[in-house]
Amino acid sequence: MASLTSGRLHVIGGGLAGSALATLMAEDGVDVTLYDQAEPFESRWTRGMQTSPESHKVSEPEIFYDPEGLVADFFARFPEIPGKLVRPAHGVLGLKRGRRKPAIVTLDEGLAHALVNRRSGPLMRAITAFGLWQKRYASEDSRVELPKGMGHAGIDPDDDRQNPGTYHRDGLAVLAEVLFSMPAHRCSNALLGRVMLPRIKSLLSKNHEPVFSAIDPIILNDIALPTLRDRFIRAGGSVAAWAPLGDIDSTSEYATDLLFGEDTQIVLKPDDAVVLALHPKQLCDAVPDIGFAPAPARRQTMAFEMRRPFAEPRCLFTSDDLVRAIYCNRRHIQVSLSSNVHLPSDGTADQFAHRIWQKCIWLSDQYLNLDLSARAENTNNQGCPKFSFVDAEAPFPELTPGLAALRFRLQPPWKNLFLCGDSFPAEYAPGPAAVFASVKQVRSQLQTFFAV
């Protein structure tokens, strides 16, 4: 590898993406400074359920889509971190339409592979495969079809986008909402197609490992991230905590100054590089010219405490009118609510939670063959386990069609500026896998930058 000691690297944002990238670059021999508005080396996952709803960290599901195993591969390079930090998770798509028999689709071998193979006969499978591949090349104005029965509060029931419902259309709409944390009717077909079918072999081959993974936040926060911090410091990196980014001064081609707080200025040399690994709102405040929409996606979730831990992580995605996803991991379940459900603002929270809990019991028994009621103990007077509501911003923008197209031609305004985070890898759904895909991409770009 070429020498990477020609300039300094300033990584702004000490979350999972910034911390991981800073550690790798420091071990590559680069002089790295990591800045954060609070304490660096913090994750978006929390140790427990009782956390502040104002924090966007609390909304992250512990089970996520990672068909390439990027998260596990990253942490596997550090022998100090237990391998059980990331475990395979069993994924199921459960669909019900009217009086018809429920469709239960196992997703472990791949999303596109599962949707194609549930069809009977080679002709139907070929037609389904071709239809999925077409979506990848659809125009950005083409939206995911919203079948009848999965209506959204903002959609006219007579709208042309309300198509006759089929299990296949239901499945695509459910996956769009789960993967992108946005109403399906606002998601572009091209965006969903690129994520489900990054390559043609996604249709023809199956994954040998489940495409969903589960992370243990306790191991992550208590072992993995402190390990990264220790390695970063030992490699010569420096930490600047409680340093909120104010602005970036520049010429037409290069960023020249970093302004932190009210009175701190960092002058950049011509061979210095800057990486922004920030929440979309902070990113847009720092670099208005990026053209990136600051509005983040939202996640409405509930969490229920369990008495007994789950032997293996599992998740269920469903076309139910209330519940969109159920994530079972450790001693609790996280419930992602449908995009057309609104959390109660009056005194009916207990009744609403009881309704969601009963729905989860029925769905888990129907599609996962799992008895949740036997695992719950700390019930209130209405037979509902201890719960918490979360109505929070996801740590990425809502990838509407125009913004999804922007990701393919997004260029930072200055040659020495790089962007790292969920939002930037064009063929990944926002989430942990996208974070580490972005870390890998930016690391390669930085190695090229410093080697010139």
State the predicted function of each range.
Residues 7-33:
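N-terminal Rossmann-like FAD-binding beta1-loop-alpha1 element of flavoenzymes
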Residues 17, 40, 281:
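Conserved Rossmann-like nucleotide-cofactor binding loop
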Residues 27-50:
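Glycine-rich FAD pyrophosphate-binding loop
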Residues 28, 243-363, 409:
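Mid-domain catalytic core of redox enzymes
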Residues 71-201:
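Mobile amphipathic helical/loop "lid" adjacent to a hydrophobic cofactor/ligand pocket
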Residues 199-260, 264-266:
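Helical element adjacent to the flavin cofactor pocket in flavoenzyme catalytic cores
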Residues 328-452:
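Conserved flavin/dinucleotide-binding core of flavoenzymes
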